[in-house]
């Protein structure tokens, strides 16, 4: 494994001729140089310099006077233009963010070169790209009150909806599922310096790496109309880490709150009485320190950062047997190191190492109300990321960029330190208690290896100017699941009396892999200076599989679970897909202050090892056996629950795979259309309006191919309790009686699910920081409707499309995290005497509810029909909704200059200022607890901070 890890880093230095693809972590500066008559000035010398650059870069204009600088790191730039016989031209204050193209046109006047015309300006409208993205710069990252994690940061972006609502970081220890403008829920990429390094399991849209908020220079989110370099059409988080500079700079910060700075919990009511709900703070402490600077000025920069974050919350709805709420203790540490070395003016190397531990000390099984500390899991979760980056300016117009990254992951749920190998897990189903030890020990080892290489080539005088970008990306990912159970059994009691024994096939190990390869080509073709066509195409190959696997020879009960070897699966899917990415940007006035954009693209929905996991025959199996405690010692001997040895019949069992993959199915994708207008209306303020449309195709679900829908017959006599209307259900009555109990589940494309659409209009206002204030705001009106599939992330793998009972009220549902009106505002403003203020406000229409009920429907078996539980949708999602959510967070700060460049900034943050403890979760299963409120937003809390920067 060591050789596999470090070989790509060796290749990084030995193969500079490779070219390939990745997402922009840099920006561009482009423009046209003309004389006073408007004629192009060829061969003018254009130079850019910035504190973000180790050395200035210089190019010459083409025959049409055009020029382009690509692969510029985020920062503030000065652009200087000189030409013989003309006065020099210089524009300062040009701010670049990741993915932004700044247009700086130079108009030269006849005169001496020694004379310079200075212009101070900051382009805020990107005239050449069609993508929709939001960049959180240092001011937004540091000065907006938030949970200081990726999910509470993305939640500030216009149009985004999330599965959680953050109050001062109360959800920062557990990641959220996000979507934007109808994207697939949890279709999320966590990109570090342009390398996609997600956790590879399930649908591939999650992370195991919890970040250091203060280590980022920028946090860019690409959402819609993305170019061919971006693989998905969901939430693409492009996190750019800080680097050193030619001057030493650093920061130390601490943020603190306790239960004493928090308002009291207001319980929701149900049937006239209060409901215990909420997870208020006990205490949080978030401390970080960072330092960066030069080892050799203009040659070698270094940066380092450390964070320790402790979070303690009371889980009010879960108590011990004495009635005290349990305390959830969480601990996070991060260490981040970066080194940048400028080998020569045209070649730069960077090395990045990030380490994270995300620890939860008492993670409890949610199946029981009372779980003792010794029966909880200990989660000590280490992860690290290694990255190597190389940028080379081959010529003035050709740049190459190579990156390689490795992500090592291990997510464990282990036994507590005091639990020995002979300690048994004891569950009392009547008293809802769990004691002794956790039900099992679990580990999820995983790794991701990615390398990419990309090129940018600029060509003028081809019916306009062209910026070609091209690239190749290759990756291999592994995801495993390991289980072990003390003595191979759990003990089940019923009211303190012997009841059952649950025997497992442990220890067991499951292995899953996927490989992905991509290539893209993109051209930004600028025609007559005002029109830019973005023409892109992307190719993706995805393969997932599991290797040859065997049961563990050390199984506790090999007689119950025979040792078996399973052959390799081969490629369960081998998808080869081509997707167009087409966009247009037009400057209607030629002033550089407004742009009309339109785009169309196909985006293939991301995948992880989920398909391989679904079909993998190796996993956790269990069998329940009746237990008679004949010697009354409370300890199950084998003779008491296996009186006939392996011939003893279990009461029930689980595990084993009866699910298969249709290897010929097509990869799911979405089609996106966007059109909008953006205009700079004052200084650094721009406003815009954009229409978004999206539909998804080739979505997947499960069918039971062992039977047909025609094997079900309609039956009456049922009533819909929501509408009180008669309800027709369907009884399984096949003419072939051997089909009873037959299951052959197949994951395949479900054409019915193609009936879906998203329509939205979004109004935005963005002002970069200048004149002491800044704004990021958006108002979104949207609707996402279609056919509902049981499952998650638009994969209906918990459904059965052969069962007509599950089709009842399946159509015309509001889907996923649909919210009709979403309004967001982030803003900072500096009052006199260096008093800083900031606001973070978010409004969401409540998410849709979907009522269901399980009916017992007798089948046609003779002589005694068997009742089959059928979970039926009583009403399409969205007819009823959760309450709307309004969240207002404020900050006050005061900056003190204490020594030259040293600044001391005390802060106080006020979260959920209105103390709106809104219900955000209700039981949707009809019955005695229908619409029972089980989750609410946490109460108002104040957090105090102190930041020292230089």
Regions found by a protein language model. Name each.
Residues 688-848:
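Gram-negative outer-membrane beta-barrel transporters
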Residues 684, 697-698, 702, 783, ...:
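C-terminal beta-signal and adjacent terminal beta-strands/loops
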Residues 2-129, 137:
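Periplasm-facing N-terminal accessory domains of Gram-negative outer-membrane beta-barrel systems
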Residues 62, 86-243, 260-262, 270-276, ...:
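Periplasmic N-terminal accessory/gating domains of Gram-negative outer-membrane beta-barrel systems
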Residues 249, 279-360, 378-404, 580:
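Transmembrane beta-barrel wall of Gram-negative outer-membrane proteins
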Residues 163, 549-579, 583-751, 803, ...:
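Solvent-exposed loop/turn elements at secondary-structure boundaries
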Residues 322-326, 438, 465-591, 793-797, ...:
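Signature of Gram-negative outer-membrane beta-barrel scaffolds
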